[in-house]
Amino acid sequence: MKSLSRAGLGLIVLACATRAVTAQEISGLVADREASAELAKIVATVRQNGLPLEPILAKVQYAVMVRSPAPRIVAAAHAVAARLEDARSALAPQPTATDIVAGENALWSGVSRKSLEEVRKVSPNKPVAVPLGVLAQLVVSSVPEKKATKYVTDLIKRGATSDQLVALGNDVNAEVRLGTRAMDALEVRMNRLNAVLGVPGANGDAASVPTSLQSGDGKKKP
């Protein structure tokens, strides 16, 4: 499983996303003059490109907190800026700032650009920050990315609410931390959702759901 510090930083990103960020606020966190000047350039470029600055602030704050050297802080800020651009492109045509932030965090968590595009494909006209956050959480919890993407996109198509998606991610994460295998925890939670949403029908969606979930009894067939 990936480190908890990664998941923790994701929470910092979402918390910072509720307010505006200034260039001075970011560059001023680093005492090294050269690094501070480089951070100011990164911030200016990100702002000029119309991308949210909050993830960069979160990254720099975290790096300073753990006493990372200045060059690593600058490199990390560059990487965040690149992921923000990649996330916006993958979530085109009109992602919200929150979508972009969630997309950047997902990419950092090990989710591929292709998976971001798959989520956008099944939800072309709605915000996707919550599904992307849950997808990232499942991947961090050691659910294979392709399977996690399949489950999340299937749930979107079947009308799962944001609360249901969030509960799924939180429950799986909690079970994994207690020692349960990620896929076992996911199947149990999916089975419960099937009871609410209905078992996938014969329209092709069922192919993405394990047989144990289609049976409705929560037990794997031999």
Residues of each region from the PLM?
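N-terminal signal peptide c-region/cleavage motif recognized by signal peptidases
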Residues: 17-20
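General marker for long, soluble alpha-helical cores
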Residues: 22-222
